[in-house]
């Protein structure tokens, strides 16, 4: 079992070495997030399953703090209100749970960040299509080459893996780097 654990950890390290080649893309996402917040707009996150949890995690880093003690930043996860999710899912279909919320709270200049390991989550694709029509910017965090989200998002980081768990690990690493860069750019440090 120790050998298996060692090999898994080395595989994770290899994934992160490959992710390092995407530093410029990560910097671009941080710039988009920083510009959004500096303009007085908000960042909205969405995802399904583990990516829903990651969406909440990243919104919390911005509203709470990542490393710096500073004022709250305007961010939210569209994955947290069970009454909205179940009402919209029941009445309109699960594929609309994010786009319906975006229609209500999104404003031109806001940013929608969609997380999906496959890049093909229909509810996120539909939300991104609506976002573009509304003047809401879009960033996709995916794996597996980007999927359909790569085609509809303004900017896509497709992390270099096809394994769901490894994609999610890299999404959190990318998200943490973005949070740190945004904090530093807006509040110094």
Curated annotation (Swiss-Prot):
Lineage: superkingdom: Bacteria
Broad class of the protein's primary localization: cytoplasm
Cross-referenced InterPro entries: GmhA/DiaA, Phosphoheptose_Isoase, SIS_dom, SIS_dom_sf, SIS_GmhA/DiaA_subfam
Alphabetically ordered keywords of this record: Carbohydrate metabolism, Cytoplasm, Isomerase, Metal-binding, Zinc
Residue sites binding substrate per the record: 48-50, 61, 90-91, 116-118, 121, 168
Single GO BP term: D-glycero-D-manno-heptose 7-phosphate biosynthetic process
Enzyme Commission number(s): 5.3.1.28
Protein name, as recorded: Phosphoheptose isomerase
Species per Swiss-Prot/TrEMBL record: Akkermansia muciniphila (strain ATCC BAA-835 / DSM 22959 / JCM 33894 / BCRC 81048 / CCUG 64013 / CIP 107961 / Muc)
């Amino acid at each position: 079992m120790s050998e298996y654990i060692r090999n898994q950890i080395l595989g994770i390290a290899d994934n992160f070495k490959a992710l390092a080649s995407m530093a410029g893309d990560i910097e671009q996402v941080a710039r988009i997030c920083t510009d959004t917040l500096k303009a007085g707009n908000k960042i909205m996150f969405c995802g399904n399953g583990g990516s829903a949890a990651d969406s909440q995690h990243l919104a919390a880093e911005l509203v709470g703090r990542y490393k710096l003690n500073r004022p709250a930043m305007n961010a939210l996860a569209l994955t947290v209100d069970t009454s909205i999710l179940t009402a919209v899912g029941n009445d309109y279909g699960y594929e609309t749970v994010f786009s319906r919320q975006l229609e209500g709270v999104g404003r031109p200049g806001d940013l929608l960040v969609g997380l999906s390991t496959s890049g093909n989550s229909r509810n996120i694709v539909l939300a991104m299509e609506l976002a573009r029509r509304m003047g809401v910017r879009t960033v996709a965090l995916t794996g597996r080459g980007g999927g359909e989200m790569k085609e509809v998002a303004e900017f896509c980081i497709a992390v270099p893996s096809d394994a769901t768990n490894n994609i999610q690990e890299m999404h959190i690493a990318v998200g943490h780097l973005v949070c740190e860069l945004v904090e530093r750019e807006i509040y110094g440090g």
